[in-house]
Amino acid sequence: MTMHITNLYGAWGTHVLAQQNVAKVARELGFTEMGLYFYPVDSDTGGELRKRLDGITSAVGNGDLVIFQSPSWNALSYDKALLEVIRAHRVKLAIFIHDVITMMFEGAPEEIYPSLIEIYNMADLLIVPSEPMLEFLKEKGLAVGKVLIQPMWDLPFSGELRVPEFQRRIFFSGSLQRFQAISSWNYEIPLRLFGYDEFKGKNPNVHFEGWKNTTELLIEYSKGGFGLIWEQTARPEYYRCNQPHKLCTYLAAGIPVLIQKGLVHERTVREYGLGFVVDSFEEAADMVRNISEEEYYQLVNNIKNISFLIREGFFTKKLLIDTVNYLLLG
C-alpha cells in the first residue's frame, strides 16, 4: 500500500505555502506527492481533462491511501472529477480542508454549497480547521463519520532565530484589502505592516514595509514585539472558524500574540500564556503600552516549546499519523 498526498503548483500565496508545507512533512513520513497544477480548467475539453487526471493519478493503486488537500483552487468540477478518478481505485480517501472558498468571499452564491458538500462527502475521513467549521458544514449536509480537527498550522523552518527582545510594537502581515480595519490604527504604539497592498495612512506610527517572504518575516518578528491576529473585513465570521496562518508564523518567531476575542485559538492563547486576547485595537495598544519587560519575557518563555513544535512540523506530523491510523484501524 502506498500513501499519497496532493500538492499545489502554479499559484502563489499563503494558501499555496500551507499545502506545500503539509506535503513536505508528509514526504518525511513516507507519502508520495501527487502534484496538481492551478490552471484555467475551462480550457480543457472533457477528454483532455480526463487524460490530465489519469496522468496525475497514474501512481495510485487499488487499496492505497490518499489525502486530498482542499481546495485545489481550480473549479469545483475539477475537484469532483479528480476525486471520482481516485475513488475508482478503491482507496482510503481523506480530504484535508484548508479553506472553504464559498465562506471566504463576500457574494459567493449559496447554491454552491450542495456541490461542495457532495465533494466532502466522498471522503472516508475529513480533516477540518475547527469545531465551529465542522458544525457549519454539518448544517449544510456534511455526512462524513470520521473527522479529525486540525490542531494548528506548522511552519517548518531549520534556520536560527534570535530570542525576541522587549519591544513595544506590533506586527501585522496580510492583505489590507481583506483586513481593512487595520488601516484605522490610530495609536502611539508602532504598527509595522507587511504585504503587497500599498498603504497610505496619516498615522506616523504605522510603518508599511512591503512584502517579505517567510524567512524574512521570521527574522523581522524575532527582533521583538507582538503579532496581531484580526478578523477579515468581508465575511468576518469565516475567520472565527478557520485556522489563522498568522498565528503559527508569530509563534514560530517566538513572539507573543494579540488575538481578537472569538477567533480560533483564543482559548489556546489564554491557557498557554502565548499573549493576550483583546476586544479592540485600543485594548491591544493598551496591553503593549502597559506590559513590563519581565512580563514580556515570561510570555516569550511560554512560547519556546510550542515554537519548537511548529518549526519542526510536529502538529502536522501527528495529524497525518492520526489520519492514517483512523483510516486503517478505525
Task: List PLM regions with ranges.
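Donor nucleotide-sugar binding/catalytic pocket of nucleotide-sugar-dependent glycosyltransferases
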Residues: D124-K138, L142-G159
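Nucleotide-sugar-dependent
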Residues: T215-A253, I259-R267
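A short acidic/histidine/glycine-rich donor-binding loop in glycosyltransferase catalytic cores
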Residues: E271-V278
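Short amphipathic alpha-helix
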Residues: V16-L29, K246
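A short, glycine/small-residue-rich beta-strand->loop->alpha-helix junction that serves as a flexible
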Residues: T6-Q20, D44, S72-A75
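Conserved catalytic-core segment of nucleotide-activated headgroup transferases in glycan assembly
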Residues: W153-E220
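Extended catalytic core of nucleotide-activated donor transferases of GT-like folds
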Residues: S43-E135
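A charged, aromatic-enriched C-terminal amphipathic alpha-helix characteristic of glycosyltransferases
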Residues: D279-E282, D286, E293-L329
